[in-house]
Amino acid sequence: MSPAAWAVMALAGGAGAVCRYLVDGRVTAAVARRRSRRAAAGGRSPLGAMPVGTIVVNLTACFALGLLTGWAGRAPAWAPGVLGTGFLGGYSTFSTACVEGARLFMAGRARAGCAHTLLMVGVSWLAACAGLALGALAA
């Protein structure tokens, strides 16, 4: 791979990380507002303290990578490296999701920690399958 291709992939990774930060922040803020309204009305949020922003980021990353992979036969040669490895590699945050699940568990919220971890793996896998199927249809 040429030095220019490496540079473009690195820039795409940085752009993906910025997008992750923005998406996670907006989703987290929206969920916090919803939780606050429910609490003011005397109710509980069905999401509890789940880190929903990270779930949304990983779900969309898995779907997008599945879509890209399914479409790869028709994609330009640069697309898998720049978009898959670069942008989506910077955007997805599976390690953060695992740490968040472990933190919930270690804070005495074992059910929430297990639910978060199982939800992340299961739903992310389903999103990747859906992306692969749609990408294959587009190819």
Label the model's feature ranges.
Residues M1-A139:
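Membrane-interface helix-loop junctions in multi-pass transporters/channels
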